[in-house]
UniProtKB/Swiss-Prot annotation:
Belongs to the universal ribosomal protein uL15 family. This is Large ribosomal subunit protein uL15. Pfam families: Ribosomal_L27A. Residues 1-56 are annotated as: Disordered. GO terms for cellular component: cytosolic large ribosomal subunit. Part of the 50S ribosomal subunit. SUPFAM superfamilies: Ribosomal proteins L15p and L18e (SSF52080). InterPro entries: Ribosomal_uL15, Ribosomal_uL15/eL18, Ribosomal_uL15/eL18_sf, Ribosomal_uL15_bac-type. GO terms for biological process: translation.
C-alpha cells in the first residue's frame, strides 16, 4: 500500500476555520462581533494606544527620567582575546577588526578584553587593551602601540 502524495491531508484539528464576525446570531459573533456594546473600543477605525490610561497621567510620565547613554559607548566595540584568532596577519587595528567582521563598520574605537587565550604574537595599533589582556598579550610575545 504505502503513502501517496494525492492522499496527504492535514491532521484532524490542525486547520481552524476563520471566525466570520458579524454574520448572524447563530455564529456567536453576530451583531457586535465580539466588541461588546458601545464605547471607544467598539467603534470602527481605531482603538486606544497601548499605555493609554484614560486621560490619567500615564506611568511613563509619572516616573522621573534617569541616566543617559554615553555617545562614546555607542561607538566603542569590545573584542575578546579568543576572537583575535580570526584575524589574518599579526597586526591588529580598527581596520583589521572590521575586515575580519569582529566589530561593526560604524565603530570608531575598540577595546580588547581578557577572555580566552592568545595563540600568537600580535601587534596592537590604536586599540585600547584592558590590564589583564595586556598581560596575556605580552606573555604571548605581542606588543601594544598607542
Amino acid at each position: 500500500m504505502g503513502l501517496r502524495l494525492n492522499e496527504l491531508s492535514p491532521g484532524v484539528g490542525a486547520k481552524k476555520t476563520a471566525q466570520r464576525r458579524g454574520r448572524g446570531i447563530g455564529s456567536g459573533l453576530g451583531k457586535t462581533g465580539g466588541r461588546g456594546v458601545k464605547g471607544q473600543k467598539s467603534r470602527s477605525g481605531s482603538s486606544v494606544r497601548s499605555g493609554f490610561e484614560g486621560g490619567q497621567t500615564p506611568l511613563y510620565r509619572r516616573l522621573p527620567k534617569f541616566g543617559f547613554t554615553s555617545k562614546m559607548a555607542m561607538t566603542t566595540a569590545e573584542v575578546r582575546l579568543s576572537e583575535l584568532n580570526q584575524i589574518e596577519g599579526d597586526v591588529v587595528s580598527i581596520e583589521t577588526l572590521k575586515a575580519a567582521n569582529l566589530i561593526r563598520r560604524d565603530m570608531k574605537r575598540a577595546r580588547v578584553m581578557l577572555s580566552g587565550e592568545v595563540t600568537k604574537a600580535y601587534t596592537f595599533k590604536g586599540i585600547k587593551v584592558t590590564k589583564g589582556a595586556k598581560q596575556a598579550i605580552e606573555a604571548a610575545g605581542g606588543s601594544i602601540e598607542e
